[in-house]
UniProtKB/Swiss-Prot annotation:
One GO CC term on file: ribonucleoprotein complex
Ribonucleoprotein found in the keyword field: yes
Highest taxon, organism lineage: Bacteria
Protein name, per record: Large ribosomal subunit protein uL29
GO BP annotations, alphabetical order: translation
Keywords: Ribonucleoprotein, Ribosomal protein
Similarity comment: family membership: Belongs to the universal ribosomal protein uL29 family.
Matching NCBIfam families: L29
Transmembrane segments: none
Coiled coil (residue ranges): none
Length: 63
């Protein structure tokens, strides 16, 4: 997911995506704690996606 893909989306779409990504991060953290997560780089990717979405939200609200 790139910032370019996100900057054209509406605020409602971004909020929905943010909620979905936070839920995904929660499940990944739970899997890591129970030693079920094999690819730990998914955590980093999810965190960066959340940061990108929050940046796009801030830019959308500033307009």
């Amino acid at each position: 997911m790139n910032y370019i893909d996100l900057k054209d989306k509406s605020e409602a779409e971004l909020l929905a995506m943010l909620k979905e990504k936070k839920l995904e991060l929660f499940t990944l953290n739970a899997k890591q704690k129970t030693m079920q997560l094999t690819n730990t780089s998914e955590l980093r990717v999810a965190k960066k996606d959340i940061a990108r979405i929050q940046t796009a939200l801030t830019a959308a609200r500033a307009k």
